[in-house]
From Swiss-Prot:
Localisation per UniProt entry: Cytoplasm
Species, as recorded: Zea mays (Maize)
Residue positions binding substrate: 290, 294, 432
Coiled coil: none
MF-aspect GO terms: (-)-E-beta-caryophyllene synthase activity; alpha-copaene synthase activity; magnesium ion binding
Enzyme superclass (EC): lyase
EC number of this enzyme: 4.2.3.133, 4.2.3.77, 4.2.3.57, 4.2.3.-
InterPro entries, sorted: Isoprenoid_synthase_dom_sf, Terpene_cyclase-like_1_C, Terpene_cyclase_plant_C1, Terpene_synth_N, Terpene_synth_N_sf, Terpene_synthase-like, Terpene_synthase_metal-bd, Terpenoid_cyclase/PrenylTrfase
Description of its domains: The Asp-Asp-Xaa-Xaa-Asp/Glu (DDXXD/E) motif is important for the catalytic activity, presumably through binding to Mg(2+).
Protein name: Alpha-copaene synthase
Functional pathway: Secondary metabolite biosynthesis; terpenoid biosynthesis
Span(s) of short sequence motif DDXXD motif: 290-294
Family listed: Belongs to the terpene synthase family.
Binding site for Mg(2+) 2: 290, 294
Amino acid sequence: MAPKTVWGYFFIDYIPEPLQVSDKQRVVELKGEVARLFEDCNCKDVVERMNLVDVVQRLGIDHHFKEQIDTALKNIQGAEFNSSDLHEVSLRFRLLRQHGLWVPADQFDKFRRQEDGSFSSDIADDPKGLLGLYNAASLLIHGEEVLEEALLFARRHLESIRRGGGLHDSPYLSEQVGRSLKIPLPRTLKRLEAVSYIPEYSSADDTTYIHPEILELARLDFNLLQHVHQNELRTVTQWWKGLCDVIGPDYGRDRIVECYFWAFSMYYEEEHARARMILARLIMLASLLDDTFDDRATLQECRELNKAIERWDESDDISLLPECIQKFFLEVIRNFAEFEDELEAHEKYRVAYARKAYQLLSKSYLQEVEWCHQGYTPSFDDHVSVSTASAGIQVLCVGMLVGMGDAATKEVFEWMIGSNNRVVRACAEVTRFMDDMADFKRGKNKTDVATTVECYMKEQNVTGEVAFDKIGSFVEDAWKTLNQAALVGDRALLPVVQRVAGLAMSMMVFFHGKIDRYTDSEHLKETLEDLFVNHVPLC
């Protein structure tokens, strides 16, 4: 049995600090001032432009300046750049790749020894440069051995510098190094980075690139957006309470705040409120479906429920199911109908795609239950095929599109639900492998189905330690695929690919350190408090 929720109905009773009209007015003024900084920066050197883009992104206000950032990056990509500073070269590489703009790995050849191609010891005592290299190299794609070497080199020397006390005089750099060694910056959710970076930016040792108007905007914008998220959490928690009144408070795991966080990880901007609210509820319904197959239903009841979900008819005879599962099924049907009601007439077709994804999820859950009851350990490839489907990522990725604006076209839905979608599969692999590593480390599995770690051990006849490391390498391979999709895929799909990557980033939050923070949600509470409860001080 999963631990109880750490949130309960907290957000129903929570009263956010009231917004000041003057704060909203000030944000408008500050946006104009920062936009002018971008205009002024066009006349300055490449390094100043790069630093401005980086600061705006890390402070979490880049959603206000998409056009300015696009223009700046095109200028950065096209401008002559001959720097031999490791931090500057790494920063340019990272910024361009983060935005799907190609830059080759040979940019780092100047920091390698001609004799054997290894990285030069001359950069081994440059923590700022090494940190930049480490974060840049985490955007590697398949076949980039030089960036594999860069990651190992930078990590080894950063850890050595930390152990030797080389960062004692730079506490904020030390904090950034610590964060990146846990989760590299390009795999970190923007809002989480903003929580840490806002105080770091305000107290930076190097004041060259500190702009008071940017800092003030970041603080105000964070709090104003947090107020939006708090109101949404109140609404979605009320929805959850109503659902529990029907199906029972103990039907499944109470993780509505965590489900909202998953939706938030894909889009936190105010203009995506409708999409976020639909997705949060859909994720909760997927979580309850998982709990139903795992804990509520017998094998035969799982089969009957899957048939009912395939038929998707509330008038269907479901009398063979227990009353609680009947109620759950009818609530699923009702909620999907509500999703449709919340869409415009020309958008209503979208819910059919979400329904299809939910049906496929049910089918994968049933397959795992069948294996469990047979005591069957599938081949590693068969397990990955089914367990990446049961990770629920396709439901989340299709569901992400349901409430979005005009960018969510029918063609994008077809692409998202396609069986050969390597982006969705890579995100599912990150999820499945990290989840299974957490399960394996704690010595228990939520169900009795073997994990991918155990399947690999049996098939390859290796120890748990060897299998564990191998599964970890598969996580890295999946990230390479996600990075590659942003660089060489259809540019029109880049915004969607980046949001799927945001979902993969959320898995780093849920499972880093091989801890399952969805099941053991008390480990996630402090992070969610920083995002949804604690205000950023305005001074």
